[in-house]
Amino acid sequence: MAAACASQGGKPESTVEPLAARPDLTWRVSTRYQVDLWLHGYAMLQKDTTLVPYFKPGYRDSIDAFKKRGNISTLLDTDGDSLRTQLASDSKLVGGQFLGLYFRSWATTQKAIDQYLKNAVSEDDTPRRMNTRQLIDPDSRAVFAIIQASYSTRPEQHWLRSFTAAMRDEDTKYYANYWRTQQTNRAAIFAAVDSLWTQTYFAKFRKFLTKSGQSRGEILLSLPLQGEGRTLGEPDRGPTIAVTFPDSVSEAVQAMYVLAHEVISPVSNGAVNDNTTPAEKKEGVADHYTSPAAVRGGLQLLQKIAPELVVGYARFYLDAAHISYTPGAEVAAIEKAFPLRPTIADQLTHQLDTDLSGS
């Protein structure tokens, strides 16, 4: 049984399948409140222009409708235009959407951000020259470096301050209760995903995960996400991968599709890196291939370990990209919609064969 955990004061934190129940289960399925809250804020602000959307289509509209019904207004509404404008013009800020994955609770997320901003900006709002290597506490040094990667300039730090204040307002006024209700309403969906993973697909993914250096990790079901998951690689604990939280029990398998799309990234990113020149990387050509390589790589992985999922996976990503297809020709449609340089595709195939060979 999945257990819902709450921090002191009734704040939602996570829904977790205990590893103790399955000592061999080195990957677990769970949820994490602050991951959803942080991604929620980005979903409400970020313009989705990618072929596979960053966020679940209709998510923003559904939240707007929910707030309208409850006559709820927050700082995210009043400051939304300025936050949205700056986000659209600064790619570093976009990368900050991964920040929630580094922390175990919303309280620790806020504390880290507050400490970072206190050290980065003085009381009179002038920037301080901060060298994270000079911090005595190694944990603080690591956390500050993580935050600084996306929020290093004064305008970016102002954006972070405003965005965090908006997230606090969202959390206090409605999102904590909204999230908790969603977890209750989706308990059967969570159980269905967990069952698919523990009873069937962990065993099928296990060899690839082990061979690709991902022998343990955590799968987070995330409300704002659909086809594009979010992956944080942590050497000590293994990857934390946020995937879509399906909308129904019948769609529970969608979480496996997105997981395949995400766990292939060490292989797909390596293939792109090895088959693009430094000049192409500088010009953004390599970035152009990253998403197609993940979609194609996830498909190839499932063809080898779980062929029963291939057609559903292909349809899921074609639908996400709003691309029509002929039933029975889904794989060909994926290859056409997500083109790859032949050398990248060949390396994907070769590396998968290597990772899945032997015992």
Indicate residue ranges for each PLM-predicted region.
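C-terminal motif of bacterial Sec signal peptides marking the signal peptidase cleavage site
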Residues: 2-4
